[in-house]
């Protein structure tokens, strides 16, 4: 059992616009395709000018590898630092972040640590947060109230110095979906008795078990999960030595890592260098956005009724903020983004790492629509 140290309070400068009632995590907001800016106007998603040259896309600075991200009902965000276990409250008005607590006992070797977060679908009643993290023994999922004790929900997920996965999301069915990695041993992804290289479906009210929880298999490193407007589950797969993938995730299907066959499911998108290193995904209406660590950009395209890419793959924020990790759309259609420039690979700026909130993300555009 992991203990938690309560450390923080609240911001004096941010007033929530309640009352709020949390709803199960479900379809994303519908965001209209961006319009071309008028002459002299700023393009959507580009850094806007702030007071005395400040960048109003940036809502938090001075963080350390923020990877977990969950949006609270009051419009603020919980941000989890991969290599410290700190959970911060970040405010959309760029008030100073507040340190709320620390998850101890992390193993941050390689890409391990605090890797993903999700709010309980009944957060207004139980105040629970779920986290995917690496310990000395395994990767596991825990649940806790802010300032409380972390209790294991699902343990025994294989760990490694690389490819630890960490994606978490609640589906419209109330189940918790978790993306795992192959831990650097690709053959494990095809082993139906091993939890590595899989997407898991976990009944948080039942008795979670081992292989019975496998939803999909044949993945390298599932770094992000996101939902379409109809509740369809999508995931990103970070792959060494091959294009990264965006997949439509279908129960009991195999996704071809490390060896594709006639029965494996093809990705809907493949991202080659230099735009690869996928870290996050989000859907708005008929369009999908995926962030890139190595590529230092956000890719976006429109999907058709069969979830195939129907428009040109475009990009924004290219090299503007460095390595981009987690994505979430809030109720106002703004896109929250975390940077990972202090992960030992990036070249951090003095104010890294940062959390961004893009008010008019250019997600959408040409291509076929979904009926």
Language-model segments: what does each one mean?
Residues 98-110, 150-164, 195, 200-220, ...:
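Surface-exposed loop and turn segments in beta-propeller and other repeat-based domains
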Residues 242-245, 266-283:
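C-terminal amphipathic alpha-helical segment
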């Amino acid at each position: 059992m992991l203990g938690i140290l309560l450390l923080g309070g609240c911001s004096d400068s941010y007033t929530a616009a309640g009352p709020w009632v949390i709803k199960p995590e479900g379809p994303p907001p519908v965001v209209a395709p961006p319009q071309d800016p008028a002459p002299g106007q700023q393009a959507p998603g580009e850094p806007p000018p702030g007071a005395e040259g400040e960048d109003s896309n940036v809502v938090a600075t001075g963080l350390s590898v923020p990877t977990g991200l969950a949006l609270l009902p009051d419009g603020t965000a919980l941000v989890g630092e991969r290599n410290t276990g700190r959970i911060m409250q970040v405010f959309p008005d760029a008030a100073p972040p507040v340190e709320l607590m620390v998850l101890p006992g992390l193993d941050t070797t390689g890409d391990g640590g605090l890797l993903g977060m999700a709010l309980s679908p009944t957060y207004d009643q139980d105040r629970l947060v779920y986290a995917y993290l690496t310990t000395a023994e395994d990767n596991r999922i825990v649940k806790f109230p802010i300032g409380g004790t972390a209790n294991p929900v699902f343990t025994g997920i294989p760990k490694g110095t690389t490819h630890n996965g960490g994606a978490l999301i609640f589906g419209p069915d109330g189940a918790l979906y978790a993306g795992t990695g192959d831990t650097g041993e690709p053959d494990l992804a095809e082993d139906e008795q091993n939890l590595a290289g899989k997407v898991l479906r976990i009944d948080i009210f039942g008795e979670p078990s081992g292989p019975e929880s496998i939803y999909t298999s044949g993945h390298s490193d599932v770094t992000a999960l996101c939902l379409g407007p109809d509740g369809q589950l999508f995931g990103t797969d970070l792959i060494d030595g091959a294009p990264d993938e965006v997949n439509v995730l279908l129960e009991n299907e195999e996704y071809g890592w490390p060896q594709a066959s006639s029965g494996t499911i093809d990705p809907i998108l493949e991202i080659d260098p230099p735009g690869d290193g996928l870290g996050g995904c989000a859907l708005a209406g008929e369009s999908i956005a995926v962030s890139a660590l190595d590529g230092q950009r956000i890719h976006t395209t429109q999907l058709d009724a069969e979830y195939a890419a129907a428009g040109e793959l475009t990009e924004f924020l290219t090299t503007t903020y460095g390595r981009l990790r987690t994505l979430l759309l809030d109720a106002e259609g703004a896109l929250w983004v975390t940077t990972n420039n202090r992960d030992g690979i990036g070249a951090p700026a003095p104010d890294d790492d940062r959390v961004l909130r893009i008010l008019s993300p250019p997600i959408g555009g040409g291509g076929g629509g979904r009926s």
